[in-house]
C-alpha cells in the first residue's frame, strides 16, 4: 500500500526546517604578503561585512593567521587555515596542531585538498584523522573530495567520492558530519578554468548528501556542501542557485577583491535552502 503524508504532517516538517546560511571560503593557497594581505582585507572588510545570510571565510597560510585575527576579529568575516596536523602535540617538526589554530582565533580549516593530497601523499586515513582533530578542537572542517578527469570519464566518480567519505564514516560514524563542511572539488576543474556544469555539480552534491542521509539524516541536514573548482563571477550565480550547493571554496578569484566580492554577492543573492 502506498503511504501518504497528511497536510498537517507536511506543515510540521516545513516548520521544523530552517534556512541554511550560504558559505563562501577564500583559499589563498601559498600567496600573499603582509602588505598585499592588508590591502585585500581592507576591501573585504568594506565590501563583505554586511551580508544577512552568507558567511565569508578567509583561509590563509599559517604565517598570516595572526594578521587575519587582528584585522577580522571586529568584522563578520571568519578565518581559518589550509591544513592541520593529525597529531595533538609532540616532536613533529613543521606541523601545526588544531589547538594552535584555535589560539589564533581560527574557526575553520581546509582538510584533504587535492593539491596537498597529491604533493604530500596524504592518504584518506590521514585525512580522516585530521578531520576528527578539527572537530575535537572546535574547528569546522572543510573536507575536500573529488575525482580526476580519468575517473569521471570512466563513470566511477561516485565510487571515488564514496570511498573518500567512507574512510571517515567507518572510523568515526556519520554523525561527525553534523555542522561540518564538504567541498566537492573535481580535481580536473581546480585551477584549469574548467568548471563542472550545474548538472554535474547538482548530481554529485545530491549523491553526497544522500550518502550521509542514508546513515544519519540529521547530520546530512546540518552538513554544508560547497562547490570548488574554477568558480568565477561569471558562473557563481548559476552554481549558487543549484539545490544542495551551499556556497563555494574559491581559489584564484579570492586573490582579487572585485572578483571575490562578486562571487560572495552571487551567493547572497541566490535562493536559500531549507533543511
Specify the residue positions occupied by each region the protein language model found.
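Active-site loop-to-helix "anion-binding N-cap" substructures in soluble metabolic enzymes
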Residues: 2-183, 187-275
Amino acid at each position: 500500500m502506498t503511504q501518504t503524508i497528511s497536510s498537517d504532517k507536511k506543515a510540521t516538517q516545513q516548520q521544523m526546517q530552517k534556512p541554511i546560511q550560504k558559505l563562501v571560503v577564500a583559499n589563498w593557497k601559498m600567496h600573499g604578503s603582509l602588505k598585499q594581505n592588508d590591502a585585500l582585507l581592507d576591501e573585504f572588510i568594506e565590501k563583505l561585512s554586511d551580508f544577512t545570510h552568507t558567511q565569508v571565510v578567509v583561509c590563509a597560510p599559517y604565517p598570516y593567521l595572526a594578521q587575519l585575527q587582528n584585522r577580522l576579529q571586529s568584522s563578520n568575516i571568519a578565518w581559518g587555515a589550509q591544513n592541520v596536523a593529525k597529531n595533538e602535540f609532540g616532536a613533529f617538526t613543521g606541523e601545526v596542531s588544531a589547538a594552535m589554530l584555535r589560539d589564533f582565533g581560527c574557526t575553520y580549516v581546509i582538510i584533504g585538498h587535492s593539491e596537498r593530497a597529491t604533493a604530500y601523499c596524504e592518504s584518506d586515513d590521514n585525512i580522516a584523522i585530521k578531520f576528527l582533530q578539527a572537530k575535537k578542537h572546535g574547528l569546522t572542517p572543510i573536507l575536500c573530495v573529488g575525482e580526476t578527469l580519468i575517473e569521471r570519464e570512466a563513470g566511477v566518480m561516485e565510487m571515488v567520492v564514496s570511498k573518500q567519505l567512507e574512510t571517515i564514516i567507518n572510523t568515526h560514524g556519520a554523525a561527525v558530519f553534523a555542522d561540518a563542511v564538504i567541498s566537492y572539488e573535481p580535481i580536473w576543474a581546480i585551477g584549469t578554468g574548467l568548471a563542472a556544469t550545474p548538472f554535474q555539480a547538482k548530481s554529485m552534491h545530491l549523491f553526497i548528501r544522500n550518502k550521509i542521509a542514508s546513515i544519519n539524516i540529521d547530520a546530512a541536514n546540518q552538513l554544508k556542501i560547497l562547490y570548488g573548482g574554477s568558480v568565477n563571477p561569471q558562473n557563481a550565480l548559476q552554481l549558487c542557485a543549484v539545490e544542495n550547493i551551499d556556497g563555494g571554496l574559491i581559489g584564484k578569484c579570492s586573490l582579487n577583491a572585485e572578483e571575490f566580492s562578486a562571487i560572495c554577492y552571487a551567493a547572497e543573492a541566490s535562493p536559500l535552502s531549507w533543511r
